[in-house]
Structure formats: structure tokens, C-alpha cells
From Swiss-Prot:
Family, as annotated: Belongs to the RNA polymerase beta chain family.
PROSITE patterns: RNA_POL_BETA
Protein EC: 2.7.7.6
Descriptive protein name: DNA-directed RNA polymerase subunit beta
Organism of this sequence: Serratia proteamaculans (strain 568)
Function: DNA-dependent RNA polymerase catalyzes the transcription of DNA into RNA using the four ribonucleoside triphosphates as substrates.
Description of how the protein assembles with itself and partners: The RNAP catalytic core consists of 2 alpha, 1 beta, 1 beta' and 1 omega subunit. When a sigma factor is associated with the core the holoenzyme is formed, which can initiate transcription.
Amino acid sequence: MVYSYTEKKRIRKDFGKRPQVLDIPYLLSIQLDSFQKFIEQDPEGQHGLEAAFRSVFPIQSYSGNSELQYVSYRLGEPVFDVKECQIRGVTFSAPLRVKLRLVIYEREAPEGTVKDIKEQEVYMGEIPLMTENGTFVINGTERVIVSQLHRSPGVFFDSDKGKTHSSGKVLYNARIIPYRGSWLDFEFDPKDNLFVRIDRRRKLPATIILRALNYTTEQILDLFFAKVVYEIRDNKLQMELVPERLRGETASFDIEANGKIYIEKGRRITARHIRQLEKDEIQSIEVPVEYIAGKVVAKDYIDTNTGELICAANMELSLDLLAKLSQSGHKRIETLFTNDLDHGAYISETVRVDPTSDRLSALVEIYRMMRPGEPPTREAAENLFENLFFSEDRYDLSAVGRMKFNRSLLRDEIEGSGILSKDDIIEVMKKLIGIRNGKGEVDDIDHLGNRRIRSVGEMAENQFRVGLVRVERAVKERLSLGDLDTLMPQDMINAKPISAAVKEFFGSSQLSQFMDQNNPLSEITHKRRISALGPGGLTRERAGFEVRDVHPTHYGRVCPIETPEGPNIGLINSLSVYAQTNEYGFLETPYRRVRDGLVTDEINYLSAIEEGNFVIAQANSNLDDDGRFVEDLVTCRSKGESSLFSRDQVDYMDVSTQQVVSVGASLIPFLEHDDANRALMGANMQRQAVPTLRADKPLVGTGMERAVAVDSGVTAVARRGGVIQYVDASRIVIKVNEDEMLAGEAGIDIYNLTKYTRSNQNTCINQMPCVNLGEPIERGDVLADGPSTDLGELALGQNMRVAFMPWNGYNFEDSILVSERVVQEDRFTTIHIQELACVSRDTKLGPEEITADIPNVGEAALSKLDESGIVYIGAEVTGGDILVGKVTPKGETQLTPEEKLLRAIFGEKASDVKDSSLRVPNGVSGTIIDVQVFTRDGVEKDKRALEIEEMQLKQAKKDLTEELQILEAGLFARIHAVLVAGGVEAEKLSKLPRDRWLELGLTDEEKQNQLEQLAEQYDELKSDFEKKLDAKRRKITQGDDLAPGVLKIVKVYLAVKRQIQPGDKMAGRHGNKGVISKINPIEDMPYDENGTPVDIVLNPLGVPSRMNIGQILETHLGMAAKGIGEKINQMLKQHQEVAKLREFIQKAYDLGDDVCQKVDLNTFTDDEVLRLAENLKKGMPIATPVFDGAKESEIKQLLEMGGIPTSGQITLFDGRTGEQFERQVTVGYMYMLKLNHLVDDKMHARSTGSYSLVTQQPLGGKAQFGGQRFGEMEVWALEAYGAAYTLQEMLTVKSDDVNGRTKMYKNIVDGDHRMEPGMPESFNVLLKEIRSLGINIELEGE
């Protein structure tokens, strides 16, 4: 493998045995591609905004005299960039402008004569834009739109599995689900009649819908039944014989023909009998007259003489009727063929319970069911039925729905109309009856072929269409009302409904979620999440076990591991690593094609439906050097089952071993050795890891770390190759390679880094350069690390030296004992940034004022504020300190005599305002790192606001000037080259000022042209600089757009540094979580023979019962990696020759059985080897991919190489006594995470606080400054102890005895420590509750 200069700095040793056939796809593509589809112009009009516009336009007036047509649309430029939107708290969006054409037709003239055409561009609201990382900035906060897994449109056949009816009879049903429009259900009842429901309303006999489609009884029976024909010849009854229909029946009479008895009465008719009848070509047999009684006629029979109806279709025949028919000359009688086995008489029975007889009565019946209580008219009934399933405005199956519908009914074509046809409805009924008759299977609704993904773009398009339809109504009104000659398209369109629909979706839809920004992994997983909840999806309460369960079709599409614990389990899933959606929105996963036992590199993406037809081998099947299967029998999956197949039967093979799992689970090393429940916790807890102060790459990883760090967008990645020209903490400048430059540009790329900003979860986002001046860079190299990344690899935690042993009960029940060294070295210190805002409003009594002049506040409290009343940057503050001084006008209240006196002495001021300053919340302390002031337009800016503005302007000017200088330098270097090539001496040039160079003329015409081009570029650069500076200045100095009634907002950012402490929650990557019980002095920790103490002591009992053995293997491998690092460190300290160093490191990389990673250090220069060694001396990072990891034997080899016992266990000594522990202890390096469940955020104590209104008991919870509930069981405990007085206090004065607690407070102040308990308020509530039930209850006095 070829490594770039940056990648050579640290190479992960990979234990993977299988070569990577397919690179890991870009992990955010599901979001970005979907949104791109939504906003890009689509000439076909299949999806996105274009499709929405085409579906609603043209809008015609009711009279048809005019119409509004759609021409095209364009998205403007956003006003603010992403960062500015976040700071100002606005939405990152672009204005949508649509070109519309108003066409007015002549009234009297023949149809289609145009009188006037007006075209105009109309503003249609703002469309939120997606940032390059797949998020949206809505009102200043980053949000993610989660993809939804919903039931695909189409037709589904299902059964109730015998649960509905007490008899346990299985009732079948069919459901036609459109993309939008009414649902149509067909279902059997326990009596085997077929019913229909529209939109899950009251059920009607299914034949009603056929009558509404204008079918007569005769036609209905004709559609669903085969006929049995009887003929009356010579007063005998002959039946036309179809031998196959007799199979399985018992003969009720002798079946004879041509004088030969084929089957005797009472005998079961078998296949042999049928073969005989067919062989002798028997066409008809004589049947006794009684046999026809009870059969059902297939059509109406009318007396030809009188015209009287003898027998209507679907009537049962009796002997009398037969005689009547015979008399009136009907010698040929058609009846329905039914039997109990596989030709049920369901439709015939249903026609009998159907109250309607013709189309009109059927339509009226449907109207009554849909609109109960409204009087039906013929027109209304017809319109309603027509609009239900046959109108393109109201009903749409969509391309997906039509494809699924036609596939289900086994039709050849997969395209067709979006509305239903008669045939569609009849074929669905036929298939349902077929399933009831035992032909065909019901669908599995949890199969991923029946569930599809709805991503951002599609949901946004649907919302946009909803807005457009609202506008359509208004436009129709306007077109009918107004004077069209003076109206323009702009007057027709009101953009409000559209913006409202879009805003509602992005702001408050259930699937638009506040982004989980704890660390890069949590961001990426949130964007790849797939939810079955949300509008049009399931609800938690109704989702049963089956929907939540892992389905065989999840393989390679949805992760079987990563899902939340709790009520949402299985409803919220994560996309597998290689999965993507196809054009219809179904999930598909890649496979390698296998031909005649040879595995090729051709890759096909298969959806769940397609996959069912193939035999697919696993990724870990053994192949020889040619790529053929080694074994004759290969373990494969086929039709959802796993079994052995011969190698010639195999069609496909998995692409990779980590194809099954999601990104989160693919980061767990030795996942294959963990129990699934613990792996689930491990995958979920990695998302809660807080970025530490200094990120530390995992010694034992899986090789996915780099992909996650780069794709998450938290790192700065080189857009083009080049050389680092400038680097500091906040910007990196690259001189681009000649071959990657565009014609006529300066060839300089500038990357501005994010410094100490707040994330959604209040963690700290900070980027730090990881490249140096002069280094060569290739496209895609990581230039700067973000939070939780280390040299471009994801680094969520720290490598800790752990020992598995008990230690004085401090690791009982998963507690964790931590060494003080971890705190001293700041290994788990994290920075949390809080944003506190102070809003100054315009009140009825006058405006609130931000000022340092606050009544009744001492000098000390104001010491950290400047003269504008805003805290200084850099001030250290603690709970209760004032951050922004603010006073609110106070209404004139009745003054107390004391106040009157004060007022008389000191004058007005003190009393007419009250202090409403912004203070630091209780329990928080930290450093102020930033302050921002937003002032409404037209409100005078205070001194601090002007200072901040001045600073921002300076910074902007400095940034742009530096940018200009860098670009100029690059340009002048090229001008210099052209001049020297054109014959100007370099020495003379150096004496001439740079800006005079462009005045020189060259004799060489080509060079002169080049020089002129460069001169143009120089002028362009300068004018560009001026424009940018001007725009920046305008943005910074303009007033802010604040909410109504708000004059000023001051935002203060407070950084809190949190060290690890007892009560914090920590975890490994294998679901091994625990709480820190004690921080132990270094000298008390167990140490090894070299005197190295361990960092963390874990309980060995946490492993066996939980079956997450991966942690032990990780510990051993981590120890080996550290040992090798130690050896490299020794060699560096002894200044050994580079050749020896190279040989040792090469040996480490080559170790392992048929490992597929090849690192050839002979291609590295000595400097590169030394730099690699420097980065490896703290431990050699190792990758052990999921399901393809290091074997036990390889771990032992590595341990040996690092000079560590192959048992992985060493002798430890007690730090307190120095005595050796009895047994050897497993010691090694485990990657530990600090989770965002910090004790500082949970610790809470209440003094006097707020009380609940009804019960007068203290509120609960930290946010309400609430108390601890002393519940029923706690009361029992006090009763059991007989602690009567304590109990009385708890139930009265400490809770809801209002007078008692006030008096108690007063007593304590007076130094009188007695209490007089009274009546608890909740007792009164109980009395009132009982009285409300109509029972009078009174308390009797003593």
C-alpha cells in the first residue's frame, strides 16, 4: 500500500486477513445525496422541488379563462454563512425564486386563444440549506433530519394469525397502501364473507365496491367463479365433466359413462380415477336430479314467453326451480363451481349480504360510510367515489407503489399509472381469495423489501407540496375574483403558507432532531439513524415484538446491534457500513459476483427482494490464490436461512466482514467475542464519550477510526495537494501543486480552524493543526484534528493501564478504582462550554436597561463587570456572580413607611427599578471566554458592543489582509517567473518595488500576454479584497434582527474545566460501564516488578456473567502494543542505528498469519522511519477488524515480541504494604471513555425552594431546584424503626404543612427549636377528591 507523507507519520498495524475489495463509502451520503436530489434542477421532473411544482402547476381558474403556469426556479445565495447563522441564532437558508407565467385566454373566442401572457419571478419563501456535514442550522442550532423507515406503498396480503376470533380461525386481509390518499382494505370475517374498508372506517361487503365500479351481479360472479354446466336431455340431467374438479371428493352416486362404472358410490375419487376418465375422454356424465339442489345459478334466467324473472343470478337451485326452468325452455343451466377445499363460495356469500343492487345504491352506501350524517345526492356520491382512488390530485401510488403493486400481482411491467384501475382492484380481490383457498403466501411486513427509507429530500419535498397545495386554493380564488388585466403573478402568490409548512417541518417535526454532538461518532451515527417512528410511521405503544426484532433481511442493511435500550428498542436502527438506498428508497448492500466457483471483483448492489433469489457466501469463506473457494461445501445464506451449499451453487459473496454492522459497532475491537447485549451497550456508550483535553488514539482499534474522523467533518481535510506554506493555531495555508491548479488562479488554499466553540451538548469543539511548515500534502490528508481525533483518527477516550482484581471492596458492583495519576496528568479532564443569555425587553413600564448601576448590590459583586454592565472576558466566576447587570422598571407599589423615609432622604432612584441581572447558575464555576452583544436596529449601541464590533472589524480586516498578502505572494512569484523567463534580470527586479513589476514590457509576445493576464488577476484580487472587506463591514455594523419586543441580547460563554472525580461514569467499548468509587493515591495502587503502578483497577467478576470477553483480549493486545512501543522507545533512547530500528518495526508490522496489510519500510527515508518511531514509542496502534481480528496465537506472538509473559498476567504488589499479591493478575491497556453523565451535573441539594400549586409539596428534579421524594417505602422504613417524630416532620413541616413550615422557619430564626405540625395540604386535596365523588367527608374535632 502506498502511504502519503502525512499517513506515514503513524501507521496502524492491521491484523485483517481479507483484502478490502470495496472502500468504505462516504458515510454521510444518505443525507447529502437525498438533499441534493431535492434542490437540484431535475429536467425529468421526477423528484425534488421540480416535481412538487409540476404536480401543482398549472393552476387554472374555476372558469377556465386563465391559468398560472410554472416555468423554472432558482435558489439565491444565503445571506449569512453557517458560522454567522449559529452566532446570530438564525436559519441557514436560501431564498427560493420561481418564474411563473400568467396566461389569460379570450372569453368569447374559441378555446385556447391567448389574450395576454405575463411572466415574472416570484419570491416563494426561504428553503433551509444543508451544511456540508449533512446538518441544518435552524434558529442557530444544528439539527439533523433522521431518515424514516416506513411501509412501502403497494399492496400487502396479511393474516391475523388467528388472534382476532375466539375460534382461532385465521382471517386473511389485503391492504392497498398509496403514497398519498385513502387506504383500501379487503378482509374476511369469521363467516368467510369478504368485506372492504376505506381509510379503516366501518366495513362494507366487498361487492359494494364492485357495484360502484358498475359491475352487475352476473358480471361479478363471472369474474370470480368457474362454471359447471348442466343440460337437461330426455328428462335426465347431464353434467359437463372436468375430471380435475372431482379430485378428493367422495362420489355421492355411481359415476358411469358409456355403460362403464368408473367410480362406485361412496368411494373417494383419486388421481388414478381422474387419469382413467381423461384417458377415455369422457365429456359428460349423468347425475341424479337431487345432485343439483343447493347449487348456485351463475346468471339471471328469464321466462322467454312472459319476460318474468324465474331465477336471479346467485340464487340456490331447488327441484321446483329446476322444473320451472325446464318448462320455460331453459335446457342449459350454468352454476358456480365451488367446493370446501380450494374453491370457496366467498364472493357468492358476500353478494347475499350485500344490501345494494345497483351502482347508485352502492355509491350512496359508500358516501354514508365516509360522510355519516350528510344527505347524499347522486352527484356528491359519484364525486366522492371518483376522488377516492381515481383522481391524480387525491391519490398517488407513486413509482415505488406501482412497482410493488405490479410485482405482487406477478405482472411483467413495473411502471404504470399512479391511480387505481378496475383491474387493479379485481386482481387484488382474486389474489386474496386465492390465498384464502390455500394458493399463495401472505407477505411478511417486516421484510425490508416491504419497508422503505424516506430521507430528508423526500420529506422536505412532501412538506413543500403541502404548502403549495395551500397556495393553490388561494390562487384559484384570486384568478376567479380579481381584475386579471392589472394583476401580475406576484400578486397571486402569498409565500407565507409555503414558508410555514417548510419551517414547521424543519423546526418541529418529530424527525427533525437536535443533533447529538457529544463527539464525532455521535454526529455521524445520528445522521445515519433510521427511525420507524414519526409521521406516517409506527408509535411506540402500538409497535409489537415482531417489528422490533432482527429480520434476516437486515443483513448488511441495518445493524443488528446498535439500537437504543428502552421503549424505542428495535424501532430506531442504524444503517450498516456499506448500505445505501436505491432509486425506489429500498436499502441495498454490495456483494461480489461469483461465477462457477470463482469470486470476481465485480460488485453488485442487491435489495432485500433481489437477494432472496440468490445463494450468498460469507465474507470469511476461505479462498485460494486464484479466488476460488477452497472447501467443497460453503456456508451460505439463501432465502433468509443459513446452510451449506456446494461451491458451484454460490452466486455472490459478502464484500467485507464488517458489512453486517453499523459504524458504531464496527469500532469495537473483538466484537465477535462479546455477547450481543453488551455489544449494544458498548456501541451506544461510545456515542456518549466526552472529548478529552488531549485526544489519545486507541492502541487497539478496528481500522475504521480514520474513516469516521474524516467523514464526520470535525477535522480539516485537504481539498487539494500542495505544500504547507503557513501554519498557526487558527489557520493553515497551502500552496497548491501546479497540476491541481485551475487556470488563472493564485493556487493558494486557506483553511480557517474552529477555536473553542460550544457544541449542542455543551462540550468543546476545537481544531488543532497536525501538520508542520513545508510538509508535502496530498488531497484528502488530515490537516487539523478536531475534538476526539488524534492524527486524523477517532480518539474518544484514553488508553489506561488496567488490572483485573478486587481492591478492598472499592470495585464492588462495577465500581472503578482510579489512580490519582490519571487526575494529575489530566487524562480525563474535559472542557464544557455553557452559553448564558440575557435579554433586554421593552416592557409596559419602559425598556429594561443593561447597566452596571444596579440597586442594592455591593461593589464586590460588580467587580467583574465593565462600565456597560457586562462581564470581562477572562473573569473567573462562580455560582451567583453577576454576568450581565440588568434593571427592570417596577410599577408604582404601595410604599412602606421605611421606604417612604428612605425616599425622602435619598431621592427617587432607588425604588423604581428592580434588579433582574443574569447570574451564574448555582453549582457552576468557570472562566468567561467570549461575550457577544446583539442590538436591535435603531437602538443605540453601548460601549461594550462598539468595542466588540471594533475588535471584529480589526480581526476581519487582519484575516482578509493576510489572505491577500498570501495570494499576492503567490501571484508575484509567478509574475517574477514570467519576467525572468522574458529576459529581465533577477537582480534588477529585486531592486524594483513589486507593484512596479507590472509596468515592465516584454519583447516576447507570449510572455507579454501572460504578464498582462497576471496583471488582470492582480487587479481582480485587489477589487475582490475591497468587496469582501466592504461586505464584512456591513455585516458586522448592521443591526440584528431580534424577536419582537427585544432590544438587546447579551450572550456570555462560560468554559468549565472538569476533572474526573468519584461519581463520574466511565466505560470501555464492550459495554463494561461503571462509576468511579474512589481516586486512590498513586503510592497505594498495585504496582508491578518494575515499580509501575496501574491506573485503574476493575472487578474481574464483571466479565464472566456478562460474557464480554472482548475486553480481556483488548487488554492483552493493548499490553503487547505498549510493550513494542516501550522497546522502540529504548532503541531511540540508546540512539541505535536507523537500520536496526527499521528492522525491528518492520518485524512488528510483518507479524501474524497471512495478514493482508503490507508495510515496506525500505521505501521510507531515514527521517520518515525516525518520525514513525517517535509516534510509535508510546505504543504501536493496532487494528483488529470486526469478525476478522487477531487470533489468540497472534496476540501471544506480539506479547512475546514486546517481552511480556504470553499468559498476559504478571505479579503485582500491594502499594500500601509492599506485599506480593497471592496470584498473578491480568494487567494490560484498555481504552476507557468518560461518559457525559458527570456527577457535577447530577449533584443537587435543596434549601428553601418552590412548591407545587395543588399539593403544596416541594417540586422534584434538579431543574426545578426540587426536593427528594420521601415515598411510601421510605415511610414504612421509619415506621419500622418507630421513629415517630422524624416521620411526623417528614410528612408535615418538611413537606406540605404550609403554616407549620412558615412558623418553623420563624422559630429557627428566633432560636426557638420547637415545631408545631399542622394539617398537611395534601390531606385537604384528598378530602376534596372524595367530596368530588359525591361522598361528604368531614373531620371531627377532638
